[in-house]
Structure formats: C-alpha cells, structure tokens
Amino acid sequence: MSMDELDPHVARALTLAARFQSALDGTLNQMNNGSFRATDEAETVEVTINGHQWLTGLRIEDGLLKKLGAEAVAQRVNEALHNAQAAASAYNDAAGEQLTAALSAMSRAMNEGMA
C-alpha cells in the first residue's frame, strides 16, 4: 500500500512520525557524536564537552598555571565549562522544542483522523 492509498490523516500522521524520528535521531547523534567548545573570557582556557556534557578536552595556555596559580586557572576552567554547558543546554532546549512541536503536530493529525 502506498502513501497515496492511505487515509489522508493516517498518511499525515506517518509523515509526522517520520519527521519526529528524524529529529530524535539528530538529537541523539548530537549527544553521542557532537561537541561544544568554549573558552573563558580571556581565551586562555578552552574546554570541549560532548552532548552528554562530559568533559572531553581541556587546553590551558602555556605558562598560565605558573603565571596565575592553580586557583585562578581553576576559576577560568570553571568559567569555560559554564560557557560550554550553556551552549550545550541551548542546543538541547532547541532540540527539545523541535521534538515537542513534532509530537504535538502528530497528536493533532491523529485526533483529526479520529474525528
């Protein structure tokens, strides 16, 4: 049976389900394979986190520990981590909104089909 032979509401729901699956796959792919990179304000420390917000990379400018000391560098690492987490959270929020919109559209299409 082709999409042309289906009830229009069923066909729409299937199309929306495929769109939702695609959006979900994209979100999961970003979480598993993506990365978010950020620096401190002075750009002396750079961190990389993955989509699960696990630290996967850290770069500290040469000589910074000696110049500023461990406490100041730790503050910069935390600042960079905060910035990377903010970027990851913004991405996750947008992805969540896309998934919610796709589910809502699917629900409306199915409800219209039952009416």
Curated annotation (Swiss-Prot):
The modification N-acetylserine is found at S2. GO terms for cellular component: peptidoglycan-based cell wall; plasma membrane. Disruption phenotype: Grows normally in liquid culture, traffics into host (human and mouse) acidified compartments early after phagocytosis, suggesting it no longer arrests phagosome maturation as well as wild-type, impaired growth in mouse macrophages. Keywords: Acetylation. GO terms for biological process: symbiont-mediated suppression of host innate immune response. The keyword Nucleus does not apply. One of its GO terms (molecular function) is DNA binding. It holds the Pfam family YbaB_DNA_bd. Probably plays a role in host phagosome maturation arrest. This is ESX-1 secretion-associated protein EspL. It comes from Mycobacterium tuberculosis (strain ATCC 25618 / H37Rv).
